[in-house]
Amino acid sequence: MNFTHINEQGYARMVDVSSKNDSERIAIAQAIVKMQPETMGKIRDGAIKKGDVLGVAQIAGIMGAKQTSALIPMCHPLNLTSVNLEFAFDEVNASIIIEAEVKTTGKTGVEMEAITAVSVAALTIYDMSKAVDRWMEITDIKLLEKSGGKSGHLVRD
């Protein structure tokens, strides 16, 4: 069996993508932070003592996407052209739904950057809110959609 990230000597290597064609790459990922309804209200009302939770999480998610190759050893450093995060309050489930869309034009996809963006944003929400809710849960981190490259356009059912 041949592994793409292991060389002939059995050591780790970054996959050579130099022969691939550049194409527009887009990935959309999601994470959910579950919490007490009171915590969600404090976040919405700007009543968390550490400050603007979603504003800081937005910046953290963007920074996370930009730093993905520094965090995940075999990820290629990419020239991202767009990172956008959106937050939605799910009142029924006392959750904040985070979605990130990441774009580039290049030889490899941006799935890991989108997943890292929502993960770091979720961790930031947790960090800034943990003083009022120690039992928050970060769940459902997943890729929702990707396009570009040989795989074409894929959407999670």
Curated annotation (Swiss-Prot):
Coiled-coil stretches noted in the UniProt entry, renumbered to this chain: none
Residues given in the record as substrate binding sites: M74, C75, H76, M112, E113
Pathway given in the UniProt record: Cofactor biosynthesis; molybdopterin biosynthesis
InterPro entries per the UniProt record, alphabetical: MoaC, MoaC_bact/euk, MoaC_sf, MoCo_biosynth_MoaA/MoaC, Mopterin_CF_biosynth-C_dom
Highest taxon of the lineage: Bacteria
EC number(s) stated in the UniProt entry for this protein: 4.6.1.17
Active site: D127
Pfam families: MoaC
Gene Ontology MF terms in the entry: cyclic pyranopterin monophosphate synthase activity
GO biological process, one term: Mo-molybdopterin cofactor biosynthetic process
Keyword vocabulary terms for this entry: Lyase, Molybdenum cofactor biosynthesis
Catalysed conversion reaction: (8S)-3',8-cyclo-7,8-dihydroguanosine 5'-triphosphate = cyclic pyranopterin phosphate + diphosphate
Entry function: Catalyzes the conversion of (8S)-3',8-cyclo-7,8-dihydroguanosine 5'-triphosphate to cyclic pyranopterin monophosphate (cPMP).
Subunit organization: Homohexamer; trimer of dimers.
Family: Belongs to the MoaC family.
Name of the protein: Cyclic pyranopterin monophosphate synthase
Upper taxonomic lineage: Bacteria, Bacillati, Bacillota, Clostridia, Eubacteriales
